[in-house]
Amino acid sequence: MYYQLDTGDDCDNNCYNNRLSLLYFSILLMLMGQLDSVSNVIADRLVYYRERGARAYGPMAYFLSVFLLQLPILVFNVLFYTIGMYPLTGLRAGSSYYGYFFFFMLMSSYCGMFMAYSVASIAKSTQVALSYFPAVLVFVMFYAGYAVYIPEMDDWQGKWLPYLSFFRFAFQGMVLNEFQDNDDLPKSHDYINKLGFDFISVSGCCGIMILFTCIFASFFYLAIRYIDFEER
């Protein structure tokens, strides 16, 4: 289905829809890969509480250890996935387009990781955290603009809920990167308008993804600093 996607005047609606689904589910794959992070944080939490109580290290040291250790792993995972998938599927040629694609995939991984860490940090047990994470994931998935296009959402939903979904901005950035001013996809402008992705640029989506990552990272840091489920 996704091997060397069609282009040109012969490209029908399936050609565009296949591209949208490929981009959407690529992001979802990165987020689902962070599910193990929930149980990992809770498993490490007892050690962190003990060491913090002994003044061996504080929340910032723990936060940095998590962040810095995961950085090369996520970069490798995203690179391994994208460097093969991108040419095989025939997505838009050009190093700059691949660079944006890689960026959004990497930032989706980071957002997903810190989202999982944030959920785990406010949950008392693994079971509770694993019930929170799917609920948050479904929310950001639904308001990404794929299952229901943003202009087709109810007024009160479409006006502000999509702005709370980092998934939406990763998806929008990747769609614009693939569709915008692409002569090989004659109907691309119509699809951009139909999705409601016509008023924030690719670079704007990059900035918003960085902002969301910082928000989730800050929330996680504040949670490990001030919440202690083992406190007596």
Please provide the spans of the model-predicted regions.
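Membrane-spanning alpha-helical segments of multipass transporters and channels
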Residues: M1-R232
